[in-house]
Amino acid sequence: ALWKDILKNVGKAAGKAVLNTVTDMVNQ
């Protein structure tokens, strides 16, 4: 289903954003 793909992409994007935020915090 299309909404499942959208949900998956949103989840991936959110995971990447969280990962980037954590990495930035660690690097500071």
From Swiss-Prot:
Cellular location(s): Secreted
Tissue expression: Expressed by the skin glands.
Listed InterPro entries: Dermaseptin_dom
Record PTM Glutamine amide, positions in chain: 28
A GO term from the CC aspect: extracellular region
Signal peptide positions on this chain: none
GO terms under biological process: defense response to bacterium; killing of cells of another organism
Major place of residence: secreted
Alphabetical UniProt keywords: Amidation, Amphibian defense peptide, Antibiotic, Antimicrobial, Cytolysis, Hemolysis, Secreted
UniProt key word rRNA-binding: no
Misc note: The primary structure of this peptide is identical to that of Insulin-releasing peptide from Phyllomedusa trinitatis (AC C0HLC4), and Dermaseptin-B4 from Phyllomedusa bicolor (AC P81486).
Function: Antimicrobial peptide with activity against the Gram-positive bacterium S.aureus, and the Gram-negative bacteria E.coli and P.aeruginosa. Probably acts by disturbing membrane functions with its amphipathic structure. Has an activity of stimulation of insulin release, which may protect the species from being eaten by predators by causing fatal hypoglycemia. Has hemolytic activity (60% hemolysis at 128 ug/ml).
Similarity-based family: Belongs to the frog skin active peptide (FSAP) family. Dermaseptin subfamily.
Protein name: Dermaseptin-2
Organism: Phyllomedusa tarsius (Brownbelly leaf frog)
